[in-house]
Regions:
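N-terminal glycine-rich anion-binding loops that anchor highly charged ligand groups
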Residues: 31-37
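Short, conserved charged micro-motifs
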Residues: 14-16, 50-56
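Short glycine-/aliphatic-rich beta-strand segments at the starts of folded cytosolic domains
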Residues: 1-11, 40-43
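A generic structural motif
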Residues: 9, 48-50
Length: 79
């Protein structure tokens, strides 16, 4: 079983790296780009075959280590 975790900055938090990427893309001719927000994508292979228990464990991982819940949001998908 695999957990896929997406971590992004909360909308209220400035994303200077995303702003630089956005400006750079505009400079390269991609004029339709309005805004970029950069985040993290994490895949975790899990031995547990119980989807509910696996998601609970990954939720704990996110709260304890993978994300800074003060400035970041995360989503978890078990596949």
């Amino acid at each position: 079983m695999k957990a896929i975790v997406h971590i992004t900055l909360k909308e209220s938090v400035l994303d200077p790296e995303g702003e630089v990427i956005s400006r750079s893309l505009n400079g390269l001719g991609f004029k339709d780009v309005i805004k970029v927000r950069k985040g993290k994508y994490i895949e975790i292979d899990i031995k547990n075959n119980d989807k509910v228990a696996a998601k609970e464990d990954v939720e704990k991982m996110c709260k304890k280590l993978l994300s800074n819940t003060i400035i970041e949001n995360y989503s978890i998908k078990i596949v």
